[in-house]
Amino acid sequence: MSPLAVNPPAPASTDPSVIRNFCIIAHIDHGKSTLADRMLQATGVVTPRQMKAQYLDRMDIERERGITIKSQAVRMPWNVDGTDYALNMIDTPGHVDFTYEVSRSLAACEATILLVDAAQGIEAQTLANLYLAIENDLTIIPVLNKIDLPAAQPEKYAAELANLIGVEPEEVLKVSGKTGEGVEELLERIVRDVPPPQGVKDAPSRAMIFDSVYDTYRGVVTYVRVVDGTLVPRERIQMMSTGATHELLEIGVISPEPIPSKGLSVGEVGYLITGVKDVRQSRVGDTVTNQQKPAQESLGGYEDPKPMVFSGLFPVEGSDYPVLRDALEKLQLNDAALVYEPETSAALGFGFRCGFLGLLHLEITRDRLEREFNLDLISTAPSVSYNVTLEDHSEVEVTNPSEFPEGRILEIREPMVSATILVPSEFIGAVMELSQSKRGEMKGMDYLSEDRVELRYRLPLAEIVFDFFDQLKSKTRGYASLDWKADGEQAADLVKVDILLQGEQVDAFSAITHKDKAYSYGVLMTGKLQKLIPRQQYEVPIQAAIGSRIIARENIRAIRKDVLSKCYGGDISRKRKLLEKQKEGKKRMKMVGRVEVPQEAFVAALSSDEDNGKDKKK
């Protein structure tokens, strides 16, 4: 067994040859955070008394859902053959929505641990992240986790993993994040196999930002990996993408609580505090350099996060609008990918149109708004961004059905995605049928082993954001896994379906759908609303329309008061007079009456698909 480090290398004066930077990539629920916990314990940076499960997942929502949303970086000392090493572990998010954060975390490392659950095998996101690691030329250490599970098949999956990355099955390490078995061997393997960082100590300083979090007391805490040169406290630094300059108030390492140091040198991973209050000023992927002696070239790879899915968020109580605005401002401090703008809806009042990276991002943001700020929210059906070309060749970007231009449209282009689906071979037929029903185009198919298949499809993003994942899981008994990335645009035959209540359009229920699906959407919504809207004194038609053409209709039957109850026998003309009078009254009421859609009907109509999905996931 390797003893704990005797003299842990001090930050700023650590020789790059004893630094090892690595990250852990895995599919959701394959045990990344649990393995990280065991490493923290084995290296002694967290005492048994301080230890708690998922130590690095700081947000309640991360711990509750068992997912990692924000990257974390921890410095751990470890001794091998009498030499003290500094291991920097970067814990990465595993979900498809946060692929950009994962790619930046990978760029900050020299190696990655490819972690696979010994009971489930390789999943789609494991593959996607593995390809990212290969693109970044990282050393890959294959590891099977959860070997203590009764259902574990370490031999079978070790062969599958070895086959995938081209090593011998004996080279695949077997560990248990729960019991700690094999963790010390893994730490020694990291020291032995991971190359030390390369960089020029005397060159102008360059450091890459791979994450930033907002701290209420200290402002933005930026996580960086130094590539060249040295960063020291009190120097003025410059962000290379924006040119903004700041004073470095504090610099240090996280082990696993922040420890200020005299600086950070080549290959080291740590944090900076500049007193900035907005995460958007220290963007993930940007390069930090010295203002006096700036580097000529940035480290590259920086992209602005681009929202893919749009949804309207409205407070159930209209008076909560200012609270929602403040809450979104605070969340944006911690989440540079969240964009929002004010929106008004005739039906739902004042709210915000928000842009998200994907459905999980939307769900987490909504959860955090409701939980941390005590808000009750209605979210409209998720939509994507369409590019519409009109006949005069002007272009309009549409993120909301209400912005859809009426009139002469030349072409509508919708965003497309490349999807990778991993499924057991017996479900191939069901998955192909589902993908084709969602307008998917098959790009290829590979057998990873006798019973696991990788299917590649090109699909419209709009078909994926609604309930594709839920349907995929239910058709494959939960065994399929999905990963996707943006893949350009494509012209499509799309129409806007409006829902009319007594001839008046209700903007919250409008949707942009493919022409072939417009009828089924119309029938679905009219049927749903017929059950949800209370009956009135007069008959109310609910119609679905494309432009001026009605494609579906349901009626809410009128409540009829028995006006003849007080007539005991008597003349028929008396009864007829009362009935005519009632008929006139209903006619007049129908002309002046307005149908109020109750709040519950909005919530049920807009979120029932989503809730069904949630039930399926449980």
UniProtKB/Swiss-Prot annotation:
EC top class, as a word: hydrolase
InterPro entries in alphabetical order: EF-4 (IPR006297), EFG_III/V (IPR035647), EFG_V-like (IPR000640), EFTu-like_2 (IPR004161), G_TR_CS (IPR031157), LepA_C_sf (IPR038363), LepA_CTD (IPR013842), LepA_IV (IPR035654)
EC number(s) stated in the UniProt entry for this protein: 3.6.5.n1
Translocase in keyword set: no
Cross-referenced SUPFAM superfamilies: EF-G C-terminal domain-like, P-loop containing nucleoside triphosphate hydrolases, Translation proteins
Cell compartments where the protein resides: Cell membrane
Recorded topology in the membrane: Peripheral membrane protein
Catalytic activity: GTP + H2O = GDP + phosphate + H(+)
Name of this protein: Elongation factor 4
Organism for this UniProt entry: Kocuria rhizophila (strain ATCC 9341 / DSM 348 / NBRC 103217 / DC2201)
Upper lineage: Bacteria, Bacillati, Actinomycetota, Actinomycetes, Micrococcales
Gene coding for it: lepA
